[in-house]
Amino acid sequence: MDDRPVEVWYPVEPTAVEGQSPEIFDSINVISEVLRPLIPGDLGGEIDTGAYRDAPPATASGPFPTAAYSHGSPGYRQAATFMTGHLASHGVITIAVEHLGRSLSTLLTPLAGADTPEDDVTDLLNALDLVGSDLGLGAVVDTSRMVVIGHSAGARTAALATADDRVVGVALLAGVPQELASNRPALVVAFENDALIDPASIWSLHQSIDNSVFVNIAGTGHAAPIDACPLIQDRGGLTELREALGAAVVRAGEDGCLPGDTDARAVQDLLRIYITGFVYEALGLLSGPLNLTAETADLVAGVELRGFNESPAVPLGDG
């Protein structure tokens, strides 16, 4: 878009990228230029996205339905390539717009906090229209139906986006409590040790939705569904960033990503299964009924559920 970047992941034919290397993304490149000089040089974290930039889109199986990812605060559009790229590899074109008002790239700049929740929804829907009119992708994308996946503040964007008839379902990950604008199927995910959003409030949101699945993942926290979490866990936290970013931002970035937390890679593997299954069901891509159950977690070693469609046993303090 003219005033902010949009990222799009889409299916490609394996032969079209044969011999090429997938894109490597370093999260330090999205940190605000105001802060970048204060960041130690060894704190960059390279992530193999598994995606190939500017590859020709697959055409044989299209048109492909759509999902959108709305990042948290502060966050960035490439924060969850473990999920966005995975969806694209399973036939779902996935869009992510940079919400400049809550972007890591605008932290401590005049743009920070400038956008309203309604602005964020407008940006997301404008990005959908942009992809639909794109010369390369327009012929292979189905923009008539979309699932919106929101993390933290992005869950509010997802919930409000249900006012648009094209949004057929939402996945809300550690989401700020926000009622849906219109009733839609929902996957509602809480993280047991979330220090920012009380799982009990997420449970209450789940109860307010007619068709909703509630998943509470054990031993992890708020930042589990971002690419950087396993890297943060590997290095033992983000202590070196406290002076540059402030203690509150660092605590939020570490939440669920410290060595004592559940293995972040296992958590993300489990999220891929639940989210992809839900997206397939909401978009009508399944030939039969989807059976997302507590036993689904048994498919991934090293991670457990604290509850499935069950109230958190001991409510945490206010986040």
Outline where the language-model segments fall.
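Domain-level recognition of soluble alpha/beta enzyme cores
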Residues: 1-66, 252-262
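A conserved short beta-strand
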Residues: 97, 165-176, 184-185
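Short substrate-entry loop that stabilizes the transition state in hydrolases
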Residues: 47-64, 69-106, 195-198
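Alpha/beta-hydrolase active-site loop
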Residues: 79-82, 89, 112-143, 160-162
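Short beta-strand/loop motif that positions the catalytic acidic residue
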Residues: 188-190, 194
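Conserved alpha/beta-hydrolase "acid-adjacent" motif
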Residues: 195-201, 224-225
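Alpha/beta-hydrolase-fold serine-hydrolase catalytic core, especially in secreted/extracellular enzymes
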Residues: 228-229, 233-319
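Gly/Ala-rich beta-loop-alpha elbow adjacent to hydrolase catalytic centers
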Residues: 149-154, 158
